[in-house]
Amino acid sequence: MKKTIFVGDLHLSADRPDITQAFIYFLNHGLDNTEALYIIGDLFEVWMGDDIAESFTIAIAEAIKTVSNSIPVYFTHGNRDFMVDKQFCLRAGMKILPEVYCINLYGVNTVILHGDSLCTLDIAYQRFRRFRSLDIVRWVYSHLPKKTRLNIAAKIRQKSVQGNQQKHYEIMDVESSAVTALLASTGCQRMIHGHTHRPAIHQLTAQEQRVVVGDWYTQGSVLNVSEKGCELVTLPFSETN
């Protein structure tokens, strides 16, 4: 049966070669009968700029390119890799999607996004999110020296980890009113997102559904969508060696 696959929150980095290995294995062996692949944010733990190419990012681009030569591969920016630009996506053969993207998926109107915009109770993060989304901020960052960008990325990552440890569970999850509002404004019956690292299929009403993809910290997490519905599948790293 034909299917569309969604993954997100891989947080690939040079420090976790096991995740990179698992993802490349998935790209090479886990896409049978797949019509399209959606990577919905935080593919990388941090992205310093398309002009700073680490060896593992080159390997990832080449592996994705092999897939995109056969099927469409779509990419949504996350909160960690929001600086990924056209250069990398061109190398990987990925099409960059807008922050909120709607598609009719096997007869169900579906809205796709990373999900951080739905965590409206996290006021401090939403303030930072608006700031880093400004064109002038992105322009200034992209023109900083490479060493400076590396230092900024390291500090942002450290501050994010420390901040999340102090936040309540509810603050770091999506806000139900934000979910309801987005479904209403887009006219969709299904929402697919990541960001929270809490994989689940939530049946909101008889007609509406919210599906959350999982992270790849301890195992792979894949969402298969077909005409039969949605299925969350785990990929143990032990099977990718």
From Swiss-Prot:
GO terms for cellular component: cytoplasm; extrinsic component of plasma membrane. This is UDP-2,3-diacylglucosamine hydrolase. Substrate binds at residues 79-80, 122, 160, 164, 167, 195. Its cofactor is Mn(2+). It is a peripheral membrane protein. It is found in: Cell inner membrane. Pathway: Glycolipid biosynthesis; lipid IV(A) biosynthesis; lipid IV(A) from (3R)-3-hydroxytetradecanoyl-[acyl-carrier-protein] and UDP-N-acetyl-alpha-D-glucosamine: step 4/6. NCBIfam families: lipid_A_lpxH, PRK05340.1. Binds 2 Mn(2+) ions per subunit in a binuclear metal center. Mn(2+) 2 binds at residues 42, 79, 114, 195. It comes from the Bacteria. GO terms for biological process: lipid A biosynthetic process. Gene3D superfamilies: 3.60.21.10. Mn(2+) 1 binds at residues 9, 11, 42, 197. It catalyses: UDP-2-N,3-O-bis[(3R)-3-hydroxytetradecanoyl]-alpha-D-glucosamine + H2O = 2-N,3-O-bis[(3R)-3-hydroxytetradecanoyl]-alpha-D-glucosaminyl 1-phosphate + UMP + 2 H(+). Keywords: Cell inner membrane, Cell membrane, Hydrolase, Lipid A biosynthesis, Lipid biosynthesis, Lipid metabolism, Manganese, Membrane, Metal-binding. Belongs to the LpxH family. It comes from Shewanella frigidimarina (strain NCIMB 400). Hydrolyzes the pyrophosphate bond of UDP-2,3-diacylglucosamine to yield 2,3-diacylglucosamine 1-phosphate (lipid X) and UMP by catalyzing the attack of water at the alpha-P atom. Involved in the biosynthesis of lipid A, a phosphorylated glycolipid that anchors the lipopolysaccharide to the outer membrane of the cell. CDD domains: MPP_YbbF-LpxH. The lineage of its organism: Bacteria, Pseudomonadati, Pseudomonadota, Gammaproteobacteria, Alteromonadales. GO terms for molecular function: manganese ion binding; UDP-2,3-diacylglucosamine hydrolase activity. It holds the Pfam family Metallophos.
